[in-house]
């Protein structure tokens, strides 16, 4: 009679996530012990390690890299002169592992022609919009498109029924790429349709981040999906080893259906994103549905990632859109950013919007952990008279990161930026909207990991009707928020010191 509870108990404590965490913790403890044992009493080794730390600091000073990241490491090395240099050699390289980098670059280079510039698609844009579009097209490279209908969703539960309808209509293929997939109501509804469509002969594929989904899926998930003819790739699989490679996660949220419809935004495939489960109060998110020519960018983004790990297609033409909406509602430019190169595409898009804004910039972000360049851009826009408003969570999912986000409030408020905290719960949306003609909806947080370490995606909207829909959503959300005042930001001396340390080390958190 006690057998079932015992089995459940051991299945919980012996699952893959728990085993991985325990093994990594043991490795960290062993490495610390080994370091202590080898350095104790060995003056020559201590001197060598200190010299290594000095060399690393000099290297960082000269390196062309994000200044906040460099300062974070220099501070850490200064605090831990014996260990700091060795830690940087082990964990300081931002680039993904060589194998991952080589695979993905090879595929992307082979399909550069699929994303060739299309000047006729941007002839209706003004000069400022064309400059931004040209940048993304050149350094992405992801072209902008007319003939694309868009629909903005102000929350996950508004998006979910429409997504199910589109999945039901699939005839040729369904591609999904997500950071988090978790068993529950949302995934069960999607999985049932995917299995049925796969049985009908529809090409169904799923890329999910192995770290993001580690706690949410059974260990035999891939086997079960493949048996149902749903092909799966766990991105950058988690192994129980201390490794920087685990930093580089696939944080994208993409659905592509028959090449004609695509979704992106902040919504993952888990119950909290549609408020079927309450974790941190009400979960406020955002997503966008695209139909038409611009879907092609997301199709290529997905296929490039897929073929890097399971080579299959050499010709992407069969996956091109077959239906274009009549007329054109502005211009849409989907894009992705990755740590494969040194081009900070996602950050530059945000910086450009702030630099070019004339009247307002409204921003949704769950986290605020930025470098001096982004901080200065926010302050400078406000000082120019632009109405800059930041909306952040009122109930955090990570308390330390929440404190870090709040540590930026004082300089921003003094510059004239208005800051709001969403009191009903956790705000997870990642959006920019400016001057009624420019917006971004995507997966890109305003933190170091999203801007420099993760694989991310977004959709730029130029003079599209859904720019106004996003603006109206922000304005409807503000009355549910608490506006932060300078008087709210008083803190004790220990608190101020903690905030300063968090700011310095924010790129490493």
What kind of feature is each model-predicted range?
Residues 364-365, 422, 441-442:
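Thr-Gly-centered strand-to-loop micro-motif
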Residues 430:
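Catalytic-core elements of nucleic-acid end-processing and repair enzymes
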Residues 367-389, 393, 398:
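Helical hairpin unit composed of two closely spaced alpha helices linked by a short loop
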Residues 179, 367, 401:
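Glycine- and other small-residue-rich loops at beta-strand/loop junctions that grip anionic moieties
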Residues 1-348, 352, 356, 396, ...:
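N-terminal localization/anchoring segments of enzymes in phospholipid and broader phosphate metabolism
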Residues 376, 402-406:
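Short glycine/threonine-rich loop-to-helix capping motif typified by GTGT followed
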Residues 416-421:
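Flexible, glycine/threonine-enriched loop-and-boundary segments that flank and lead into catalytic domains
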